[in-house]
């Protein structure tokens, strides 16, 4: 059997020299490799890498201004741009399209045209983003239907992605209809503290199917099956337990209304105390029924007298996907009490208004609210920011549920109470507090559980309002904090909140 020995790594230009030195050591110790593939968010072809002593290198970079699909940098380094198919001398075929998530949908036609005419049997698929099917299987909210379509067409033996820069992930192998085995992996960036380089042997030639035995941990093809349980290898990271609201909700992205809801047990839920991986260093306050935590990858940033981001989550201790105010009156009041205490702190201590965002859906995993401080001079522009994002959602992203927000004058509005007490309703809601004394304005849009919703919608609206466009994604390098930074943030938040902490006065 003929094997190709391959190494896949993820580096940035700032750490390139150090990472290449380590790759050389790996090549000396565990190689020599036949091929090294390197992911990078950006790569300047004029940037020099000392690749002496290394085998053939493939560098991948997304540069839409560059229309070339490949370019030879030197004798053993090839730069691949944007998307295309590249065949090596040993017969290995690579297909790649490395556009980021925010441009994938717009490039869908060109991507499908590019690969739709190809009859090549692809060995390795290289993308920036994950496919939607595998993302949903893993409880992630990011994921692209475009990646799904190409993965199903190309049926590569290995699929590598690199959009998650901090987590190594390896899905158990699965099989296509023609008996070809496939594996999916996410490679984090060098410096993440996780496995940033992955080595493997791949049979090449006509005997690949015959030479590769069926692995004992073979799973159902994630592109063909509906996930109803969590049969996955966990992310190798302490940040798997993410205190970011958007990561805890699953939307139904299929038109099939009979699709089963994915069940997450409390022991595996990111927000449940029974989860042994709970990131308790981020907890601010624990009440009888509710607790308060800082947000993973906060949207807002310190401003003026506020030396914390102020972005926090109100979470029921009980594992409930959706809150029913008509049946959970005590819990509802406890959540609103925490909400009011934060509004008071933001206004009195930091001269800030407050906006609260929530998703009530039967397909959620663990209900919670996100609370974000907003400067007074910006809160009056909220409606404009909301209207803008609604327009994009309804007109540009045609697969999303069409959102139409209704405004209510208070929590006691009869029309509002009727909506939230009707458990058949699923909805997105913003609650805007200008002052602690005045009733808030509530903006609510209902949707059908079978419809696709943008789980980042609330964050997009507020990122635009706060003029923080680079902080839309909680897991971007701009937003993520180290564990030490998260601990310091929580300690500062606790200190600021102490005077307003309702858990200190609860019976």
Swiss-Prot record:
Could you identify this protein by its name? CWF19-like protein DRN1
Q: Which organism is it from?
A: Saccharomyces cerevisiae (strain ATCC 204508 / S288c) (Baker's yeast)
Tell me how this protein assembles.
Interacts with DBR1. Interacts with SYF1, a component of the NTC complex. Interacts with lariat-introns and lariat-intermediates.
Any single GO molecular-function term of the entry would be: enzyme activator activity
Family note: Belongs to the CWF19 family.
Phenotype seen when the gene is deleted: Accumulates pre-mRNA splicing intermediates.
**Domain of life, per the record?**
Eukaryota
Post-translational modification Phosphoserine, affected residues: 242
Lineage, uppermost ranks? Eukaryota, Fungi, Dikarya, Ascomycota, Saccharomycotina
Name a single GO biological process. Answer: mRNA splicing, via spliceosome
- Tell me where it resides: Nucleus; Cytoplasm
Keywords annotated in UniProt: Cytoplasm, mRNA processing, Nucleus, Phosphoprotein
Its GO CC terms are: cytosol; nucleus; post-mRNA release spliceosomal complex
Q: What is its main location?
A: nucleus
Is Kinase there in the keyword field? no
Effect the entry attributes to changing residue 366 to A: Causes accumulation of pre-mRNA splicing intermediates
**Job of this protein:** Involved in branched RNA metabolism, modulating the turnover of lariat-intron pre-mRNAs by the lariat-debranching enzyme DBR1. Enhances the debranching activity of DBR1 in vitro.
- Name of encoding gene: DRN1
The further comment given in this record reads: Present with 1270 molecules/cell in log phase SD medium.
Look up keyword Nucleus and say if it applies: yes
Result of altering residue 272 to A: Causes accumulation of pre-mRNA splicing intermediates
Question: Per UniProt, what does mutating residue 474 to A do?
Answer: Causes accumulation of pre-mRNA splicing intermediates
The residues that cross the membrane are: none
Which SUPFAM superfamilies does this entry report, sorted A to Z? Answer: HIT-like
A Pfam family hit: CwfJ_C_2
